[in-house]
Amino acid sequence: MTNIKHLAIIMDGNARWAATHNLPKSEGHRAGADKVHELLPEFINLKIPYITLYTFSSENWQRSNTEISFLMRLLNIYLKKELDNLHKNGIKIKVIGRLNLLSDSLQKQINNAIELTKDNNKLTLCIAFSYGSRQEITDACTKIIASGKTEILESDIQNALYDPEMPDVDLLIRPGGVFRISNFLLWQAAYAELYFSQKYWPDFNKEDIINAIDDYSKRKRTFGKR
């Protein structure tokens, strides 16, 4: 049991994990998806109500067509394969990002998952796909301006984000040995505690999650106050 309401994870290191095992990048991404399946029961046991996974960034569109195509197929396969199990376990699916850039078939699969699980309340699994936080904030401001508002409040931006109901991030974990947040949930993670690990995401396990949460529990969050 933890007091974390929103855990965000940058699932980094899949390609480098594959390289260390003399495997193609695709196998690293597949191992990363398998790791989500492995750790979801632990997130449920910890009673963390909201999990966001950074799976495909807006910058990832600059990768090779082969890698992009595989990642699109992988999300489609994951949703088809895991949807019944996610639904059975009371998990609500949300997907945030510029989803209009995805194929019609993938958008349909995403919408089907969202619709099927919309009333579940044990855990919300938010998949950030074709996502960039600067783009999200830009899209929110564009939406507000289009509504005719001339004075923008903080609450207006919050309500125009991809998921207005998303709670602020408490803990942001990044495996992979990289020490940056890479345009991920900049608005929502304004006061998040950050935890970095040298381990690649496919090697991350239950004990690593527990260690990150234990480290978080020892910190004093001041939110700018003394």
Curated annotation (Swiss-Prot):
In terms of PROSITE patterns, this protein maps to: UPP_SYNTHASE (PS01066)
Which key words are in the record?
Magnesium, Metal-binding, Transferase
Cofactor binding annotation: Binds 2 magnesium ions per subunit.
Q: Which domain of life is it from?
A: Bacteria
Active site location: D12, N60 (proton acceptor)
The Swiss-Prot or TrEMBL record lists the needed cofactor(s) as: Mg(2+)
**MF terms in GO:** ditrans,polycis-polyprenyl diphosphate synthase [(2E,6E)-farnesyl diphosphate specific] activity; magnesium ion binding
Q: What EC number(s) are associated with this protein in UniProt?
A: 2.5.1.-
Q: What SUPFAM superfamilies does this protein map onto?
A: Undecaprenyl diphosphate synthase
Q: Cite the binding residues for Mg(2+).
A: D12, E193
What are its GO biological-process terms?
polyprenol biosynthetic process
Does the entry annotate any disulfide bonds, and if so which pairs?
A: none
Q: Does the keyword Zinc apply?
A: no
Subunit composition and interactions:
Homodimer.
Q: Which protein family is it in?
A: Belongs to the UPP synthase family.
| Function per UniProt | Catalyzes the condensation of isopentenyl diphosphate (IPP) with allylic pyrophosphates generating different type of terpenoids.
User: What is the name listed in the Swiss-Prot or TrEMBL entry for this protein?
Assistant: Isoprenyl transferase
